[in-house]
Amino acid sequence: MMRILLFLATNLAVVLIASITLSLFGFNGFMAANGVDLNLNQLLVFCAVFGFAGSLFSLFISKWMAKMSTGTQIISQPRTRHEQWLLQTVEQLSRDAGIKMPEVGIFPAYEANAFATGWNKNDALVAVSHGLLERFSPDEVKAVLAHEIGHVANGDMVTLALVQGVVNTFVMFFARIIGNFVDKVIFKSENGQGIAYYITTIFAELVLGFLASAIVMWFSRKREFRADDAGARLAGTDAMIGALQRLRSEQGVPVNMPDSLTAFGINAGLKKGLAGLFMSHPPLEQRIEALRRRG
């Protein structure tokens, strides 16, 4: 909770600085001179409230959504020795990472994958696919679990949601400025906001949202290196490298993880060229090389 409060305080400061900067550069006067009567301070606050509300709401229901969308079955009482081993391994890794043991689940998927989610590092969920358990060695599975525990211990789910909230705020803000400018200056609407405002705002939100997602994905890729590093500390560097090499050998297998969870899975598929800017995970080769440099 302290992380959320500190981050919100930081971003309120960012919003305030942005408002002051726009005023200093005479943006309010420019808009008013062109017939756009817009209170930028009120608009920034409005966009911040709705921008953060959406991302934080998604964060708070993330565990429930993950269970529903993947069909994850929570292991409350282990029925097999594999489930017993899974619970014991997660318990050990959680203890070593200094967090409360998360819920542990298995979801039905042939692909080798895993994810972590939850609004709090002490109220999280870690789940693995049937494919991962069937085809990976115990050391490799442990390394994957350590990677996911690393996400939880680092508070990545919270941080990514807050970064998304900042992005949402400024996408909404600039889309509405563009919409007002087009409506008042180009189409000369006089009585309230015309149809041009709504069409332009929606289009601008789509375009700006798409471009801004590259920023969120850049942060997500940085986050993966940190989770790999945590996995190496908890399970051993060789085991973490081995797990990533095994994932690399399965890159032809389609990834069917829901979009909302892809950023928190260990395997997100492969994209090339400019599409790489919108990847939630770095290429496996880069992740393996980073671990090798770690020693």
From Swiss-Prot:
Localization in the cell: Cell inner membrane
One GO CC annotation: plasma membrane
EC number assigned by the record: 3.4.24.-
Cofactor note: Binds 1 zinc ion per subunit.
Keywords per UniProt: Cell inner membrane, Cell membrane, Hydrolase, Membrane, Metal-binding, Metalloprotease, Protease, Stress response, Transmembrane, Transmembrane helix, Zinc
Gene3D superfamilies registered for this protein in UniProt: Metalloproteases ('zincins'), catalytic domain
Transmembrane segment boundaries: 4-24, 42-62, 158-178, 199-219
UniProt-annotated catalytic positions: E148
MF terms in GO: metalloendopeptidase activity; zinc ion binding
Record's keyword annotation contains Cell inner membrane: yes
Annotated positions binding Zn(2+): H147, H151, E224
Enzyme class, broadest EC rank: hydrolase
Cofactor(s) needed for function: Zn(2+)
Family classification: Belongs to the peptidase M48B family.
Name of the protein this chain belongs to: Protease HtpX
Originating organism: Pseudomonas savastanoi pv. phaseolicola (strain 1448A / Race 6) (Pseudomonas syringae pv. phaseolicola (strain 1448A / Race 6))
Gene field: htpX
